[in-house]
Amino acid sequence: MVHNISLSSRKALHNVHLPYMVQLPKPTGYNVALKNAAEGYDKARRMVAWLYDIADYESSIPQTFTLQQKTDKYTWELSDNFPPHLAVVPPDQSVSAPSIFSPVRLAQTLLIMSSLWYDDHTDLAPGPEQNTMQKLTQWNQERHKDQGWLIKDMFNAPNIGLRNDWYTDEVFAQQFFTGPNSTTITLASDVWLTAFTSEAKAQGKDKVIALFESAPPNSFYVQDFSDFRRRMGAKPDEELFNDSDGAMRYGCAAVALFYLTAMGKLHPLAIIPDYKGSMAASVTIFNKRTNPLDISVNQANDWPWRYAKTCVLSSDWALHEMIIHLNNTHLVEEAVIVAAQRKLSPSHIVFRLLEPHWVVTLSLNALARSVLIPEVIVPIAGFSAPHIFQFIRESFTNFDWKSLYVPADLESRGFPVDQLNSPKFHNYAYARDINDMWTTLKKFVSSVLQDAQYYPDDASVAGDTQIQAWCDEMRSGMGAGMTNFPESITTVDDLVNMVTMCIHIAAPQHTAVNYLQQYYQTFVPNKPSALFSPLPTSIAQLQKYTESDLMAALPLNAKRQWLLMAQIPYLLSMQVQEDENIVTYAANASTDKDPIIASAGRQLAADLKKLAAVFLVNSAQLDDQNTPYDVLAPEQLANAIVI
């Protein structure tokens, strides 16, 4: 398309002052460089938007394209290391990094990535002198006290390291109910229970065996990362490591067994720091505290057990960052967007329901592929780049749509939706909130799609050729290649569920797995992205571990890795803006020119208001009142993947 710039616009361009081109003096320190970079990014963002508007080039005014035009604009890239994705973001959809991220946080991140060190920059990461956990926690507390009034950094917001009990079994376990990855804890299978029972007998753990025999059915759960090697294309006993970027790092595939009491206390019982295909080939350690009420053990000094818990959370970092967050929200939603743009006309009701939940996702994902994964994730992970990319591709290809619908997912993992408000599950706030949010969103979608104007019966869905084309595009090897997407959608209920799922991924699910990262991950000892010393090869070796062994596993001598581990969660956890939350979406929907959407939007707004009150109660019922669970509160819930 040719864009003509009027004479008056050209004169305006000649006379305009471009603040982002002003020559600034060489910075004298980190804070000065950060201030200059942040101001420059913000000015550039505003100037670029203004220039586009006055030149009438891809302006901020919405444009409508025909289905053929969209098909031509949205093409697949199928030949790089990533799952199928958009080849090139169309100019009218392209959003710059400074418009997506906080300019200050982005500038901080770029300074860290580019290794532009200044004398006072070293304060953002500890050094070898912080060689005990007590020194590390004191350092973290002091950094939070030292925040200036102008330039804020990753220590401006609280993190888990400010808790005196951050390392305890209670706080460790609760992270799998209300932390960044609360989506994968699963009822232990008979196979796992048999394996742990046999190992407990071999190690003479009589109290553990007695608990296995006396506990009610469905009392044991696992966080299971044992399939990492298979999914990454590694051999069962292959050592997982990454020696790029000048720092040797190790990955692990841990398994943690938990006991969930009838009153809802989740307690870790046993850990395999790195599962290598069988229990015999792996190391298994049992908790000295079989009973969660046992206070006879000094948890602070139980270094073998603390090391094992660190392995679990490091494994969880990998699953969360690469799969639960990146793949299962960002990349999967991009496939939905591209397929819908190619096969659904702008006036199609499904397209109209989904489009508001896309916003900056395509530009954000392009940045992730070009920068975040190769320049951040790979340099701090404990797995090689080929293993990481294989892990992501495998997860994308095998993404199981219907089994991940919220009610089905919770049921399959051992959390019956009709029992979520019982004492046993009262601490699983993610499950309680996300299930109610799914029900609310499904009600909204259903009230629109089931209207007689759109799909009065199943036959009207089965006869919709564009819906069938969308299914084909999602499954095709020349499209998204997601063969677990339905081969066809032929009933109203099936369509309602799928549209609800697409909104769920973009809004509540992404919010749940993204916005808690700063709190749980900027304090690196809680959840390191990798281990910086080899893992133990026998239980005898692990049982001899002292504090120095755990400290050696942390990146105290790898400052860049520490900084990236801490900074990226801070970059990605910026507070959701009011115009980006689900409440504003409902308000906008309530004034839609389509009366059906408007009516549904008004009901959605009312339902969200009720949910806000319910979620406050759910958080107040948590045993742990030190860290509220409010990430899914409607006013904090992002309407789309905006960061």
Swiss-Prot record:
In alphabetical order, the GO MF annotations are: linoleate 13S-lipoxygenase activity; metal ion binding
Effect of pH on activity: Optimum pH is 7.0.
Against Pfam families, the record matches this protein to: Lipoxygenase
Q: Which reaction equation describes what this protein catalyses?
A: (9Z,12Z)-octadecadienoate + O2 = (13S)-hydroperoxy-(9Z,11E)-octadecadienoate
Keyword Manganese carried by entry: yes
Residue ranges of coiled coil: none
Cofactor list: Mn(2+)
Q: Which PANTHER family match?
A: LIPOXYGENASE
Query: What is the protein's name according to its record?
Result: Manganese lipoxygenase
Taxonomic source organism: Pleurotus sapidus (Oyster mushroom)
